[in-house]
């Protein structure tokens, strides 16, 4: 799967808006993930105790983790598909230490699309959404291949 230059332009254009408030976007994305798929919360010892959206919004740890997640994803997106070096340690930790199923990466991808659309409706139309979906699908496909190399069937 390959994105065109025009698709990468759309992806990186919206990502520039994310970078204006990485922690805030990350927090919103994690809250969206946890609300939509509460089972994902069980993978996070630091956040298991957070039961309400208000508790999640008040959590500095959640905000910090959202920043970490989106900083890593931004680094991957900026490589425009040439993300082998960035992907390897991420796949290693998510497969062997955290045991995060690929399905959960689909869930967070959906949360990313949802939050970007709700925060930036004028800048995240159908073309940009399709491009971001394609970029996130490429990421998931490549991380799934790494999982397989590591013997994790997540």
Swiss-Prot record:
Main location: cytoplasm
Catalytic activity, reaction form: Fe(III)-heme b-[protein] + nitric oxide + H2O = Fe(II)-heme b-[protein] + nitrite + 2 H(+); H2O2 + AH2 = A + 2 H2O
Molecular function per GO: heme binding; metal ion binding; nitrite reductase activity; oxygen binding; oxygen carrier activity; peroxidase activity
Binding site for nitrite: 65
Compartment list: Cytoplasm, Sarcoplasm
GO biological process: removal of superoxide radicals
Keyword Lipid biosynthesis included in the entry's annotation: no
EC number: 1.7.-.-, 1.11.1.-
Assembly information from the UniProt record: Monomeric.
PANTHER family to which the protein is assigned, alphabetical: MYOGLOBIN
Family: Belongs to the globin family.
Name this protein carries in UniProt: Myoglobin
Organism: Balaenoptera physalus
Name of the gene: MB
């Amino acid at each position: 799967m390959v994105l065109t230059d025009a698709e990468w332009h759309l992806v990186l254009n919206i990502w520039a808006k994310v970078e204006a408030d990485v922690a805030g976007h990350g927090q919103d994305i994690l809250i969206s993930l946890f609300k939509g798929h509460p089972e994902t919360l069980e993978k996070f010892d630091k956040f298991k105790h957070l039961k309400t959206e208000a508790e999640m919004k008040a959590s500095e740890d959640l905000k910090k983790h959202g920043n970490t997640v989106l900083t890593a994803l931004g680094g991957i997106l900026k490589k425009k598909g040439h993300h082998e070096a960035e992907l390897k340690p991420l796949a290693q930790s998510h497969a062997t230490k955290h045991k995060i199923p690929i399905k959960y990466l689909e869930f967070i991808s959906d949360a990313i699309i949802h939050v970007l659309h709700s925060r930036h409706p004028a800048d995240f139309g159908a073309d940009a959404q399709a491009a971001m979906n394609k970029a996130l699908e490429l990421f998931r496909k490549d991380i799934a291949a790494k999982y397989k190399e590591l013997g994790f069937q997540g």
